[in-house]
Regions:
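Peripheral, non-AAA+ core regions of ATP-driven protein-machinery
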Residues: 1-214, 218-224, 327, 466-467, ...
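Short beta-strand elements
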Residues: 18-24, 279, 383-386
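Basic, amphipathic alpha-helical bundle interface domains used for macromolecular binding and assembly
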Residues: 34-45, 60, 67-77, 285-286, ...
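Residues immediately C-terminal
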Residues: 110, 299-300, 306-307
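Conserved alpha-helical scaffold flanking the Walker A/P-loop in AAA+ ATPase domains
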Residues: 204, 260-261, 266, 276-299, ...
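Walker A/P-loop
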Residues: 215-256
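Conserved inter-motif catalytic segment of the P-loop NTP-binding fold
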Residues: 241-275, 282-283, 389, 429-438, ...
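Walker B catalytic acidic pair
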Residues: 296, 302-303, 314
């Protein structure tokens, strides 16, 4: 006897349809699984036998051959357990319904319970594209998958529930579509920040255009404090951004099962002890790293020179492309990483280099070695560099509150609305992602701005990349002012935001 049942596979974020073909024939009892499955797939035989025997179904006396098609694609993990069990139930006529429009996903325990499975939303989206109408999966994953429109999702707690459902004894109702809503959450407010007007303005520009930022200054000037308040001025996530981010967090097993859709932009603060694998992802089965977990949000690297230089160098390509590709023998996996990189650092090991209120105890060689841990190509990818000086006693002791995040966010939202209209019909989401081919069209300058940028290019020895990034930051400054064209003052602001590489790292970019 022959039967086939649909399932879904996953490698990285790449979901694909899998067909479990099963043949029950006469002969020496056996249970074989073919189709390029890994060790976890082969071990599923014991889980499946145990789960079925627990409800009085024995496969020990049968000769079963299961093929997971397509046979040339590597199958990794335990999520095929439920697919194979459904195929066994179908070939033994325990389930007699037409299953051609159904798909079954999930790991099954020895007791027959379905286990929470990561990466469900990616597989649910692909299942719909493949024409699947009904999706059966672990009950704990049902809410996550139900966000996909046009797909009936059935949460199954135990394989006996599946049998009773198709037998008509106890029908399972489809999971109601989950409609995510923007969460109201407590964030630290910019009004807590004393002084630092330039840094506040820099973060406003950065949040409006999704630009990368470097904060540099002596210890105790509030670099980390102000960075941690960035989430309070970031625009809400769109639905598409939310689904993208949820897919990554689902694979990483980081979703809240009660609120399985990420609706708040991530803020990932990474320790300087992080490895390259921890930062960009990796492993035998590639998992997303911190840069991908921060997708559509903020990646914060404090004490930047304390990171291993080789680790920082791995950021160069993903910062440029917005995607990280990890290659393994069984294939390549790509994870999106469209992030706002925020970094903070002291200007030297003791922290007082260039500080008029403190004495630097570092030698010139120590300072050069410290700053040299950040390569010029990495520095060139940071659009906005801002110095945070030590505060005066009057600034620290003042009871006056700074401008609240809500007022700053209001201006940022207006700038983002301008960008949305500008980028309508394209895949561009923010000024920082304008490709070179669109720069001339989307960043028009008046004559004064052109002349100033030309002068700066010659005097500062700017690279082509730095030129592009200055233009993008100037575009954001103009948007915040409501100007359609980039003016001289916008170029001036953007150039000033790149002046620290001359002060601390020598010649400009």
């Amino acid at each position: 006897m022959y039967s086939q049942v649909n399932g879904m596979g996953l490698f990285g974020m790449n979901a694909f349809k899998v067909t479990a073909e099963i043949m029950s024939s006469r002969g020496q009892p056996s249970f074989d699984i073919v189709g390029l499955g890994d060790l976890a797939v082969q071990e599923s035989k014991m889980r499946i036998k145990g789960a079925l025997s627990g409800i009085g179904i024995s496969v020990s006396g049968q000769r079963l051959t299961v093929n997971l098609a397509p046979a040339d694609v590597r199958k990794c993990g335990s999520l095929y357990d439920f697919t194979i069990i459904a195929a066994i139930l179908a070939v033994n006529n325990i389930i007699t319904d037409d299953l051609s429009g159904c798909a079954f996903i999930g790991e099954v325990s020895l007791g027959g319970s379905l286990v929470f499975t990561g990466g469900i939303i990616s597989m649910a989206i692909e299942a719909k594209k493949c024409g699947i109408k009904r999706l059966f999966l672990p009950a704990e994953n049902a809410k996550e998958a139900s966000v996909v429109e046009g797909l009936s999702v059935y949460g199954i707690s135990h394989i006996s529930d599946l049998i009773n459902h198709f037998a008509g004894k106890k029908r399972i109702s489809p999971e109601p579509p989950y409609v995510p809503s923007a969460e109201m959450f407590e964030t630290e407010d910019l009004s807590d920040v004393k002084g630092q007007a330039l840094a506040r303005h820099a973060l406003e520009v950065a949040a409006a255009g999704f630009h990368n930022v470097l904060l540099i200054g002596p210890p105790g000037t509030g670099k980390s404090m102000i960075a941690k308040r960035i989430p309070s001025i970031l625009p809400p996530m769109t639905f598409d951004e939310s689904i993208e981010t949820t897919g990554i967090h689902s694979i990483a097993g980081m979703l809240d099962r009660e609120k399985p859709i990420v609706t708040v932009r991530p803020f990932r603060s990474v320790s300087h002890t992080a490895s390259a694998v921890g930062l960009i992802g990796g492993g035998s089965i590639p998992r997303p790293g911190e840069i991908s977990l921060a997708h559509n949000g903020v990646l914060f690297l404090d004490e930047l020179p304390e990171f291993d230089r080789r680790t920082l160098e791995t950021l160069r390509q993903p910062l440029e492309d917005g995607v990280i590709t990890i290659s393994r023998a069984q294939g390549s996996v790509s994870y999106p990483c469209d992030i706002m990189l925020v970094t903070a650092m002291n200007p030297c090991p003791c922290g007082n280099f260039g500080n008029p209120k403190g004495k630097c105890t570092c030698s010139q060689n120590m300072i050069q070695n410290y700053l040299g841990k950040i390569s010029r190509p990495v520095l060139d990818r940071i659009d906005i560099q801002v110095e945070m000086p030590q505060l005066s006693y009057e600034e620290i002791s003042s009871a006056k509150k700074g401008e609240p995040s809500s007022a700053v966010l209001e201006r940022i939202m207006k700038a983002r609305e301008i960008q949305q209209k500008r980028f309508a019909g394209t895949e561009i989401r923010s000024n920082s992602k304008i490709p070179p081919s669109y720069l001339h069209e989307m960043c028009p300058m008046d004559e004064n701005a052109k002349q100033m940028l030309s002068d700066c290019f010659d005097k500062m020895g700017l690279s082509a990349r730095a030129y592009d990034r200055i233009l993008k930051v100037a575009r954001t400054c103009a948007d915040l002012s409501g100007s359609e064209v980039i003016r001289r003052q916008d170029i001036s602001s953007a150039v000033n935001f790149r002046s620290l590489d001359r002060k601390y790292w020598g010649a400009g970019k």
